[in-house]
């Protein structure tokens, strides 16, 4: 069954996103539902489809299960949905917050201290030179993979490496004296970048990666960087909240 839970007392058909291949073709009614307490969490089956994100929990959780196939991931990102879960003890969980935290590339904020770092030109930058090293460091830097809530496990790494291989995931590498100092990776669809993770092996390297990404996107008509969740660090660099409706308008206009 595709739909497992709906709002308490709901007796009318709910909705899910229907697709052909990886193309969004609209919202259709589905009679497959069962009542729960006071929220909706959908259990995905093997069909490449997602529930209407407006039906999710306040924290953005809309579904569990499914898989990390390229077709499902691309459909997810085209609708503002992304996977996030502890690979050690949880099934795949899918989120779509209604308040979207983004950075518009042309509005990236560079602090005075960070500008001084950049002016010293100690870093050099590449795009997609070593995606495998970047995602592996995002997983293991500072012992992240040892934490109970670690989310970037082998299955996720393999899924995003495949997206990279077929042209939908991008890495930014930051180098210092020929050594990898930091970087980030994410999904690229059209003129939008969906950030997944970043790391630093040297001070300021991940900030430098984000600034380089934003400036590169700004010079190539990039529309937005999806930061997924709000943090004070990203807020200080220009992150801001927009509505899901505005977010989707930007994605669909690309």
Model regions: which residues?
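Residue-level detector of alpha-helix boundary/anchor positions
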Residues: 2-3, 7-9, 178
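Local alpha-helix boundary/kink/capping signal
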Residues: 16-20, 89
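Short hydrophobic targeting helices and cationic amphipathic motifs
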Residues: 3-5, 13-16, 30-33
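N-acyltransferase acceptor-side catalytic subdomain
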Residues: 24, 28-254
């Amino acid at each position: 069954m595709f739909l497992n839970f709906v709002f308490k007392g709901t007796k009318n058909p709910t909705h899910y996103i229907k697709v052909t291949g990886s193309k969004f073709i609209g919202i259709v009614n589905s009679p497959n539902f069962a009542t729960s307490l006071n929220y909706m969490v959908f259990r995905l089956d093997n069909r490449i489809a997602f529930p209407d994100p407006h039906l999710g929990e306040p924290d953005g959780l809309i579904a569990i299960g499914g898989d990390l196939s390229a077709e499902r991931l691309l459909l997810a990102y085209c609708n503002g949905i992304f996977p996030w879960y502890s690979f050690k003890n949880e099934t795949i969980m899918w989120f779509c917050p209604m308040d979207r935290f983004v950075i518009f590339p042309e509005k990236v904020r560079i602090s005075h201290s960070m500008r001084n770092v950049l002016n010293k030109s100690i870093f050099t930058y590449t795009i997609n030179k070593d995606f495998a090293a970047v995602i592996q460091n995002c997983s293991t830097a500072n012992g992240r993979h040892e934490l109970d809530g670690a989310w970037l496990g082998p299955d996720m790494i393999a899924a995003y490496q495949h997206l990279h291989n077929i042209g939908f995931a991008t890495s930014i590498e930051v180098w210092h004296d020929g050594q990898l100092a930091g970087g980030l990776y994410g999904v690229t669809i059209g003129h939008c970048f969906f950030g997944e993770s970043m790391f630093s092996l040297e001070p300021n390297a991940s900030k430098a990666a984000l600034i380089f990404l934003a400036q590169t996107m700004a010079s190539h008509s990039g529309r937005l960087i999806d930061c997924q969740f709000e943090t004070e660090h990203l807020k200080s660099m220009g992150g801001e909240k927009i509505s899901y409706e505005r977010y989707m308008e930007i994605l669909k206009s690309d």
